[in-house]
Amino acid sequence: MFSVTFNSQKLSDLISAELAQWRAKWPSTTVLNGLADGLVHYTKGGKRLRARGVQLGFSLADGASQLEDACLTGQVAVELYQASALAHDDIVDNADLRRGAPSLHRFYESWHRSEER
């Protein structure tokens, strides 16, 4: 019998860690911190179907345990790409919500207005 284990929480933690690494490289400015906050907010949730596909392909290819970190890196990359595609789609469609929360451009719009003082 074939089984694939997928850990959505671990993937979410890795995405947050990746974004935290990006944030650590940026100068500590309000603008860049706000951008990072938006990315963290936008990459939470979802079914993670593409990442599950990466995991399934890795497992079907008889994924070796020493390559698990590379598989997780691939999952993070696919999820970040998907988030960018969804953000683009929301802009084109002028959508206010994504998964019941403000779409990324609306999140940034609200954040930007709160910073205009």
Annotate each language-model stretch with its function.
Residues 1-78, 83, 87, 91-112:
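Conserved N-terminal diphosphate/IPP-binding helix and adjacent helical/loop segment
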Residues 116-117:
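Conserved small/polar residues in nucleotide/adenosyl-binding loops
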